[in-house]
């Protein structure tokens, strides 16, 4: 069982944040929800903290940077390219599509493949995103995530 946990966590670190290194190009969507979702575009800095070292011993706390764009033609989706900071430099972890729920003010991304199944849920709180990464279907909490938008990048 411990081997499965270590393998799972290795996938989380290398797979979740390193699978897709593509860069998404975005544009501002139209409409009310589009106006709300466009406010998410930019760079977000913060932390991803392990909360269950017993079950996921390979888990490491990380400083993270999320680059958020709205994919062309989408009004309810953002693409987040995630980096972790290693020795002061960004290291690509992956790119994921999140569904935006304007009513609940949440972003959700579910990832499933032959080896893992997990969900990332983030609450939008103004210039902060706070949430969790949990395994599915059991919803075992793995990480707590807190990031803040870098407003300097948005200004000319």
Please describe what each predicted stretch is.
Residues 20, 24-26:
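Boundary at the C-terminal end of the N-terminal hydrophobic targeting segment
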């Amino acid at each position: 069982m411990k081997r499965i946990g270590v393998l799972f966590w290795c996938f989380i670190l290398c797979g979740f944040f390193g699978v897709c290194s593509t860069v998404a190009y975005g544009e501002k969507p139209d409409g009310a929800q589009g106006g709300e979702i466009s406010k998410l575009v930019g760079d977000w800095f913060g932390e991803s903290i392990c909360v269950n070292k017993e079950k996921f011993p390979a888990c490491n706390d990380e400083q993270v940077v999320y680059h958020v764009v709205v994919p062309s033609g989408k009004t309810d989706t953002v693409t987040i390219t995630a980096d972790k900071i290693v020795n002061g430099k960004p290291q690509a972890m992956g790119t994921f599509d999140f569904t935006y729920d304007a009513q609940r003010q949440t972003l959700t991304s579910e990832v499933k493949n032959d080896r893992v199944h997990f969900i990332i849920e983030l609450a939008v709180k103004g210039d902060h995103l706070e949430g969790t990464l949990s395994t599915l279907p059991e919803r075992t909490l793995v990480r707590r995530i807190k990031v803040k938008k870098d407003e300097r990048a948005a200004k000319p």
